[in-house]
């Protein structure tokens, strides 16, 4: 993970590369990181006896560097090569002005300079190259965007209007002058990024969120890690608002204070969600009235708010988030967040910074523990519907329709939450990324060539000569035995899928695989895993799935850039044609298919174990008869 990020940093474009310095800020003082820094030719800044988690590590790095601008990246955030050239120019705006007549940029004159115009932070959107848990667990890969896109691509950019953009801790550029003025990264919070942006704005600096994705990271891969991450965000935002008093500060505009008030109230909205779920249950099951009103009074107060909320979501979310998905996400997270938010607001603080795990520590993404509250609420909702409709007919059912609709509306969201927490198996170790790159497969002549390619220091010697030159399509009669052109369709850290123009004999197993053209072009060793023909619609193309190995460090570095310096291809908008019915049918069908697959695997393993036991019994019988013969022979002697 760290290799990918550091490698991408060394490939970033900049007019004068000598002014770009890349460092590992390591508060673990690990030998592996020291070795990796030396391997990639970048700096290493250790932080011994760090008592302040990420803030202490970053402040230590600030003390050991001098550049006027600092870009920060989390270990899993891989920057695009265009990151610096797209972000650094914003810091030049105080010295430049655009001519209204010609549109050309020029230096500001002394009279035009404004000392109050100071850029402190440029934040790019957070994006991810793997599916987030809502996409993955709900089998909605191409139906919904990443859950965090709504904040990064919509909310944070709208906060620009009040200069209340939030620093999200990674893929951002910060002014050193601004950091020195506010005393560095704040220590007494578990979300130092959010509080840093608050303090920069209160110091008179402009913070701005851009709309172009400049880095891709790794989403959390299991429900418990994601919930812990959200608890840290909730507690940290409340801590930072209390630490800075930003809601009541006159150092920022009134609109910015309202924005931060909304940030605080957002985390309390999960209480609203729980009340919204429990209210009809309490009335239908226990005759407890949360609100004592008539139907018309309810419609007068509820209907306008529902209408304006729906309209604002449609106008402001650009099809990234809908009211339905906001309800599903809030319902999923609410039971886990209400207690931490309540405690933090009362001043019972969480002071320990907990790093969010991004590596796959399990082959399941779900969590039964997080599912339990939703299961309980589903049982109560079903019981409430049955009790409330039992024995009612005609107009009695009509008068009860509001409560019944309310219960069913909440029940659907709860079923989504259960499906989410139920998780899904994750058989792959690395993420596949959709690509469209030229590929040339050069077949190698001997079956055992794979072992020759992967041993030693890198130069693989085949029966007919050295590893073929991937820069040319020409072949030697004594070396490669065939060249097959195609297009790489998807790639991962350990494999590539190539659509080939013509099939080749399956006896060919080892290949030199040339990938890409232009800036990134590399050749890797490939071992055929599967050769198959597509049966999807009219597509009758042949595909070759290959496992790859890198023969050198440089080869791996270029391959990583070819893989990650691109758009991810993951859905960025909601599928407008996808309905709740479609979701339910898809989730149920895929769950049944997964259960059948697991049953077949279990049955196959059981059969193999039974056959193995039979073979073992047979061998034991033969050994026993053989030993008996020896005993009888010894007795006869």
Name each region found by the language model.
Residues 7-19:
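Short, acidic, metal-binding catalytic loop of nucleotide-sugar glycosyltransferases
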Residues 46-67, 81-190, 201-202, 223-265:
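Long helical/loop segments within the catalytic core of UDP-sugar-dependent glycosyltransferases
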Residues 199-215:
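Catalytic donor-sugar/metal-binding loop of nucleotide-sugar-dependent glycosyltransferases
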Residues 367-371, 396-637:
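Structured alpha-helical
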């Amino acid at each position: 993970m760290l290799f990918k990020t550091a490698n991408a940093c060394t490939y970033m474009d900049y007019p004068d590369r000598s002014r770009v310095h890349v460092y590992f800020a390591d508060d673990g003082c690990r030998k592996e990181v020291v070795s990796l820094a030396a391997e990639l030719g970048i700096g290493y800044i250790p932080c011994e006896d760090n008592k302040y988690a990420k803030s202490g590590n970053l402040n230590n790095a600030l003390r050991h560097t001098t550049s006027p601008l600092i870009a920060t990246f989390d270990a899993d955030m891989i920057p695009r090569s265009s990151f610096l050239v797209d972000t650094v120019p914003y810091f030049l705006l105080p010295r430049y002005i655009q001519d209204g007549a010609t549109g050309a940029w020029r230096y500001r004159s002394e009279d035009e300079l404004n000392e109050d115009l100071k850029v402190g932070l440029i934040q790019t959107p957070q994006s991810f190259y793997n599916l987030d848990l809502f996409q993955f667990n709900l089998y909605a890969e191409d139906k919904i965007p990443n859950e965090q896109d709504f904040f990064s691509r919509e909310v944070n950019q709208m906060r620009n209007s009040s200069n209340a953009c939030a620093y999200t801790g990674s893929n951002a550029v910060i002014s050193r002058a601004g950091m020195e003025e506010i005393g560095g990264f704040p220590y007494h919070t578990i979300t130092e990024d959010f509080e840093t942006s608050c303090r920069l704005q209160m110091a008179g600096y402009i913070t701005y969120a851009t709309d172009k994705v400049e880095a891709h990271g790794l989403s959390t891969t299991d429900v418990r890690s994601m919930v812990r991450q959200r608890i840290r965000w909730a507690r940290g935002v409340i801590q930072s608002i209390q630490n800075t008093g930003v809601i009541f500060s006159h150092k920022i505009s009134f609109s910015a204070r309202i924005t931060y008030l909304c940030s605080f109230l957002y985390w309390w909205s999960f209480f609203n969600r729980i009340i919204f779920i429990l209210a009809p249950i309490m009335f239908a099951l226990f005759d407890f009235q949360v609100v004592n009103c008539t139907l018309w009074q309810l419609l007068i107060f509820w209907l306008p708010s529902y209408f304006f909320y729906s309209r604002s979501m449609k106008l402001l979310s650009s099809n990234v988030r809908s009211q339905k998905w906001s309800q599903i996400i809030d319902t999923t997270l609410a039971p886990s967040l209400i207690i931490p938010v309540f405690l933090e607001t009362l001043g019972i603080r969480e002071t320990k910074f907990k790093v969010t795990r991004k590596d796959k520590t399990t082959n399941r993404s779900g969590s039964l523990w997080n599912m339990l509250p939703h299961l309980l609420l589903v049982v109560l909702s079903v019981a409430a519907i049955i009790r409330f409709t039992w024995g009612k007919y005609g107009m009695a059912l009509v008068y009860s329709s509001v409560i019944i609709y309310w219960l069913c509306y909440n029940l659907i969201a709860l079923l989504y939450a259960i499906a989410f927490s139920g998780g899904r198996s994750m058989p792959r170790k690395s993420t596949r990324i959709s690509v469209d790159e030229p590929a040339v497969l050069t077949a190698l002549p001997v079956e055992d060539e794979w072992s020759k390619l992967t041993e030693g220091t890198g130069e693989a010697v085949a029966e007919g000569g050295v590893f073929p030159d991937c820069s040319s399509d020409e072949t030697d009669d004594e070396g490669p035995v065939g060249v097959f052109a195609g297009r790489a369709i998807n790639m991962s850290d350990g494999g590539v899928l190539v659509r080939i123009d013509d099939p080749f004999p399956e006896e060919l197993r080892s290949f030199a695989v040339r990938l890409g053209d232009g800036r990134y072009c590399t050749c890797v060793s490939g071992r055929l895993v599967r050769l198959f023909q597509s049966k999807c619609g009219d597509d009758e193309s042949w595909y070759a799935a290959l496992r790859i190995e890198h023969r050198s460090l440089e080869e791996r570095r270029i391959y990583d850039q070819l893989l990650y310096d691109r758009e991810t291809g993951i859905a960025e908008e909601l599928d407008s044609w996808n309905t709740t019915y479609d979701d339910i049918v898809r989730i149920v069908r895929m769950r049944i298919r997964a259960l059948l697959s697991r049953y077949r695997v279990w049955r196959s393993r059981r059969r193999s174990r039974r056959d193995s036991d039979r073979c073992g019994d047979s061998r034991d019988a033969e050994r026993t008869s053989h030993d008996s013969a020896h005993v009888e022979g010894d007795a006869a002697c």
